[in-house]
A protein has these predicted regions:
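Conserved AMP-binding/adenylate-forming
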Residues: 27, 49-52, 67-112, 429
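Conserved AMP-binding A3 loop
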Residues: 55-57, 174-202
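AMP-binding/adenylate-forming catalytic core of the ANL superfamily
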Residues: 112, 129, 271, 363, ...
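Conserved pre-ATP/AMP-binding loop-to-beta segment of ANL
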Residues: 160-178, 184-185, 211-221
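Conserved AMP-binding/adenylation subdomain of ANL enzymes
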Residues: 200-221, 229-269, 284
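Gly/Ser/Thr-rich phosphate-binding loop
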Residues: 268-272, 286-347, 360
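Conserved ATP/PPi-binding loop(s) of AMP-dependent carboxylate-activating enzymes
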Residues: 343, 354-358, 366-396, 428-430, ...
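AMP-binding/adenylate-forming catalytic domain of the ANL superfamily
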Residues: 486-508, 525-527
């Protein structure tokens, strides 16, 4: 039996923490309540990884058993519990168990070093840790730990259901998610129940997947290749239990050949990933021999998608063309800002769509010729950075994103770069994203990273690290760029190769690492 929660589609303005937000009056209030939807899907497979297949019933029993175990160990409301591990059924069960007892899951990055784990434990004032084998080896010895393992298959049918205590308010902390740290030390973003549930409700609303809009035939297999410890992973967990999705997860880190095998074997219908992952799958030799016809929907985020990427999808996955989707968001706003799908991704390449129903967007400092900083205001935004006094949110509720962008006359948003990444060459501002978009138009370019490097007279010059598939040269790329960008934005330094660029734990190109290595090499060459 599903929880007695009313999900509405009407929107009104409500004062939240002294700020006027657009909200759904009829809404869920606590993420722990969502676990009850597992009963609707019963014996359907919910989590698939390797040889493990966990049904929705298995999940609910295992979560309640784990919640009882944690509560018996003294954990409860407001305790901050570090979950440190790679994607697995145990990760998901531990997350839901923390939510059920009112604890606050602190999502650790499975790729962190020992010192980064120690920093996170200190930053978020972690009470206890739940860690897999790899994660356990990185934990500070003084930190208390609880058992990672979960009794998935052995959960006893006769054990009474776990009875949760009084629910915290919707504006109390629900989860702590760390930023990627690409601009420095990762920040601990505290998201409320309202933050997560408002984002979930908006997505279910626009896709017509609210609980009362779906039937028992809804759902299907979805490939999940991103880390659960990012905001996108949390969104996937919440959505999948509402619509009855089967989460198909690779074992370990992302591998194109394994992704292809899983799509064929589990007849995957949906896949959410960053563009780099999708490109590498479609360019893998096995893509020509695997049956990918069941894949009907691809959602990409983490980087703009251009016409060339959509064309790659058309050729490699012709069945997904009407259902290519993208969007824009960041951890600090619960990952939910804008969305685009279908024809919009074809007719407006480079756009991340229009604002979601409860999201307001404005562009600070924008003029007719200059893009402005993107500011967002919505109920999805964070409460604060844990352990930090500064906040990117103004008194009237506007979140400074640090991204640059603009909106066209039809309300579609375009993200053109990061303010901090702007290359300033002889007084001219150059957005790396715009240069990368132009490079993507060249047929032989597989992927690229554009950044600034020091120049004695101009301050900076433009450098491009480019992966090509057809033996293209720097001279050919330069000629192409002269036709597509201003003369001052044409890269004057090139790194052309055939091996993939390094990626971070989210599967995105690690531009920081590429730029750092290039600058060090240039410095060495100049000596």
């Amino acid at each position: 039996m599903s929880p007695d929660i009313v999900w509405g589609t009407d929107i009104e303005v409500e004062e939240v923490r002294g700020i006027p937000f657009k909200v759904y009056p009829d809404r869920p209030r606590h993420i722990g309540d969502l676990l009850g939807y597992a009963a609707r899907w019963a014996d359907r497979a919910h989590i698939v990884q390797g040889t493990q297949v966990v049904s929705f019933t298995d999940l609910q029993r295992a979560v309640e058993a784990k919640a009882r175990e944690l509560a018996d160990g003294g954990l409860g409301a407001d305790d901050r519990v570090l979950i440190l591990g790679w994607n697995s059924p145990e990760w998901i069960i531990n997350f839901w168990a923390c939510a059920l007892i009112g604890a606050v899951p602190v999502l650790g990055n499975g790729w962190w070093s020992d010192s980064e784990v120690a920093d996170a434990v200190e930053t978020a004032s972690v009470t206890v840790a739940l860690a897999d084998v790899r994660g356990s080896a990185k934990l500070p010895k003084v930190l208390p730990t609880a058992r990672w393992a979960c009794d998935v298959q052995d959960a006893d049918e006769q054990v009474p259901a776990f009875v949760a205590g009084e629910r915290a308010s919707e504006d109390s902390p629900a989860v702590i998610v760390f930023t990627s740290g690409t601009s420095g030390r990762p920040k601990a973003v505290v998201l409320a129940h309202r933050s997560l549930l408002a984002g979930l409700q908006m997505l279910l609303h626009i896709t017509r997947r609210l609980p009362h809009m779906v039937d028992e035939n809804t759902g299907g297999a979805g490939l999940h290749t991103g880390p659960m410890f990012h905001i996108g992973g949390v969104q996937t967990l919440l959505r999948s239990i509402i619509v009855g999705d089967t989460l198909v997860m690779p074992v370990g880190s992302f591998k194109p050949d394994e992704a292809l095998r899983l799509i064929e074997e589990w007849k995957v219908a949906r896949w959410s990933a960053v563009p780099t992952m999708v490109s590498r799958v479609l360019e893998h030799p096995d893509a020509q021999t695997r049956d990918l016809t069941t894949l009907k929907s691809v959602t990409v985020g983490g980087a703009p998608i251009h016409a060339e990427f959509v064309d790659l999808l058309r050729k490699g996955l012709p069945g997904v063309e009407p259902r290519v989707a993208t969007g824009y968001g960041l951890t600090e706003n619960g990952g939910q800002g804008t969305a685009a799908s279908g024809r919009d991704t074809v007719e407006r390449p480079g756009s991340c769509g229009r604002p979601l129903p409860c999201v307001e967007v404005r562009f600070e400092g924008a003029t007719d010729d200059v893009d402005g900083e993107v500011l967002l205001r919505s109920p999805t935004q964070m409460l604060y950075y844990y352990g930090e006094e500064t906040s990117p949110i103004t008194e009237d509720g506007w979140l400074h994103t640090g991204d640059l962008g603009r909106m066209d006359e039809d309300g579609y948003v375009y993200i053109t770069g990061r303010a901090k990444d702007m290359i300033i060459r002889g007084g001219e501002n150059i957005a790396p994203a715009a240069v990368e978009a132009a490079l993507a138009k060249y047929p032989g370019v597989v992927e690229s990273a554009v950044f600034g490097v020091p120049h004695p007279d101009l301050g900076e010059e433009v450098m491009a690290a480019v992966v090509v598939s057809d033996g293209s040269t720097a001279d050919q790329l330069t000629e192409h760029m002269r036709e597509h960008v201003s003369s001052f934005a044409v890269p004057t330094r090139w790194q052309v190769e055939t091996s993939p660029l390094p990626t971070n734990h989210a599967g995105k190109i690690d531009k920081g690492a590429v730029a750092e290595a290039a600058r060090a090499r240039l410095m060495e060459e100049s000596q």
